[in-house]
Structures are given as structure tokens and as C-alpha cells.
């Protein structure tokens, strides 16, 4: 389960009545969408605006305007590089290219206290891997959608003391399956989506929930992606 944001590109791999079966261009995630929520463009256009020339919005909530002065709501991380193809215009702030690692923390702070939503990728609702994916994507680094996929990237760190802010910590269940991810902050704190986007402590055991005063997740691995 996931969400598409404004400007996300995908290819149609099947159709059933009014539904499109799609695969997203950036992370090969598959699912179904209503055909009314899509605008068809060429493969070359999709490759350009969806991968090569992305420009992401940086405001939590913003608007894009049509030629008829109608406003469409945008959330942070919307890719407006293809707005002209839809005869729409946007004049707000955007970010393009790869940012420095410390910029990840600035972006992460914008999602703080967003409610948890399985499959969500916006400040109105987001899950743990959607949070880390969007933080990295907005700053120019594409990582997969799911926590287990993200854990396959980067270099493995043996101890928290070897990490730096912006690295990712992954957590598993009793069967050893990775089920959770969070963004490491300074001084052994971690930002993650659990009920809401929150900041808790982290140690070699896992995440220590500051509200319940007990560990909520078991640490499996720490990865340095950039």
C-alpha cells in the first residue's frame, strides 16, 4: 500500500474498467488507481520530469494554479517539474538535485507529529518507510518504498556510535523480518513514525519510547546510505 503525490510518474501495466494497474517509475511499486487521477504523457516526458529533472515542493501545504485560476492542493514532496504539461503553474519554493546530508534533518523536522497512516507519504498521514523515503527523495536521493528494501542499501554500521545524523536504523520482529525504520538524529535520538511522527531515544537494544518508558522496537541494523 502506498500513495502517489502530484507529479509522480508511472507506467500502466494493466487496465480493468475504470482502474489502471500501474508501476511507479521511481521505485517500481505496483498498485491500482482510478483512471481519472492520471494524465497520460510520453515515455520520454515521464523519464525527464519523473527522474532526470525533478523539482519538489518544500512547503508542508501549497497550491498549484490552472489556466482557469483554479487551485489544486499540493503537499511537501510534490514534483512540479511537469506542471506545464498539464497547463498548470507553480511559483512557490522548490528543491532540485542532491542536498548535503544535514539537510535531511531540516526536512525531517517538517513531518514531526504527522499522524501515522499505513501507506501514507504526506504530513496528513505517513508510515515509517514512507517518512524516510520522502525525506531522502526531497533531498535528491531515491530509496525504495518499504523498510525491508531500504535495509538492503548502503554500508552496515556495527554500533550507534559509528553513525551520524541522517543514517537509517532498521528494526525487526520476533521472526527476524524488518518491519520498521527511522532516521537517526544527534545524541542517540531517532525520528520515526509510530502512532505519529515522533522523536525517541535509541540504544543498542532498540527504540526507547519516551512516553511509555520502555523499548518499543528491536534494533536489527544501522545503514549509512549517503
Language-model segments: residues:
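Hydrophobic/aromatic-rich core segments of domains that either
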Residues: 162-174
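Boundary regions of SH3-family modules and the immediately adjacent low-complexity/disordered segments
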Residues: 2, 6, 16, 24-114
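Structural motif
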Residues: 8, 78, 166-167, 188
Amino acid at each position: 500500500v502506498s500513495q502517489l503525490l502530484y507529479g509522480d510518474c508511472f507506467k500502466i501495466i494493466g487496465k480493468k474498467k475504470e482502474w489502471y494497474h500501474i508501476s511507479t517509475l521511481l521505485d517500481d511499486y505496483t498498485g491500482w488507481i482510478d483512471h481519472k487521477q492520471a494524465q497520460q504523457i510520453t515515455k520520454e516526458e515521464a523519464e525527464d520530469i519523473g527522474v532526470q529533472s525533478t523539482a519538489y515542493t518544500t512547503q508542508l501545504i501549497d497550491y498549484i494554479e490552472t489556466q482557469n485560476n483554479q487551485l489544486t492542493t499540493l503537499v511537501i514532496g510534490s514534483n512540479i517539474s511537469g506542471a506545464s504539461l498539464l497547463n498548470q503553474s507553480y511559483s512557490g519554493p522548490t528543491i532540485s538535485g542532491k542536498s548535503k546530508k544535514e539537510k535531511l534533518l531540516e526536512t525531517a523536522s517538517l513531518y514531526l507529529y504527522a499522524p501515522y497512516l499505513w501507506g501514507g507519504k504526506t504530513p496528513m498521514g505517513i508510515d515509517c518507510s514512507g517518512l524516510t523515503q520522502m525525506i531522502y527523495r526531497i533531498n535528491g536521493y531515491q530509496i525504495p518504498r518499504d523498510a525491508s528494501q531500504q535495509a538492503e542499501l548502503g554500508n552496515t554500521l556495527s554500533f550507534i556510535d559509528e553513525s551520524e545524523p541522517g543514517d537509517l536504523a532498521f528494526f525487526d520482529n520476533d521472526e527476524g523480518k524488518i518491519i520498521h525504520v527511522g532516521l537517526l538524529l544527534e545524541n542517540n535520538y531517532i525520528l520515526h513514525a509510530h502512532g505519529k511522527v515522533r522523536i525517541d531515544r535509541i540504544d543498542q537494544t532498540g527504540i526507547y519510547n519516551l512516553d511509555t518508558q520502555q523499548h518499543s522496537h528491536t534494533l536489527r541494523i544501522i545503514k549509512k546510505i549517503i
